[in-house]
């Protein structure tokens, strides 16, 4: 499976937003773009550049490459409702994202690895595709041989209950989670403007 293999910290500095827990700590120390002129004043940003930056934020935040991201957009357009809202809701339903939201991994990259290595079951069936779309009522749990892994236990212990969203019910003791409902856009607090992404793709 193709995925981004560069430095997410450098990308975070370039975009001016933390795209991972590690990048968040780094940005606190170096809140400017990388490179020789990173601390210099930036000129006026064009409308296209703003739209492109928002798309990059979403892609890197969720770990999605261009082809798949564009497919999400096409699917969002075909659905009823606001295209931007549809786009966010689709991406939030990804299994790797739900695993991260549930606190089973400290980052989406870590969650993606758990899924890819076949550690998880959805409704009792093994699923190793990070982009698998979870539906309301789905039960996500670890395979018997994968339960109580140190990395997962540590992540759950570190994840505050306040971080776990209302649309996911987590049983920490048994390392299970139920996807209760598709979240509304207003409930998703992420540093991007999906409407600018829609404007970019609709040109």
Swiss-Prot record:
Residues 93-154 form the S4 RNA-binding domain. It holds the Pfam family S4. GO terms for biological process: ribosomal small subunit biogenesis; translation. This is Small ribosomal subunit protein uS4. Belongs to the universal ribosomal protein uS4 family. It comes from Chlorobium luteolum (strain DSM 273 / BCRC 81028 / 2530). One of its GO terms (molecular function) is structural constituent of ribosome. The gene is rpsD. One of the primary rRNA binding proteins, it binds directly to 16S rRNA where it nucleates assembly of the body of the 30S subunit. With S5 and S12 plays an important role in translational accuracy. Keywords: Ribonucleoprotein, Ribosomal protein, RNA-binding, rRNA-binding. Part of the 30S ribosomal subunit. Contacts protein S5. The interaction surface between S4 and S5 is involved in control of translational fidelity. GO terms for cellular component: small ribosomal subunit. PANTHER family: 30S 40S RIBOSOMAL PROTEIN (PTHR11831), SMALL RIBOSOMAL SUBUNIT PROTEIN US4M (PTHR11831:SF4).
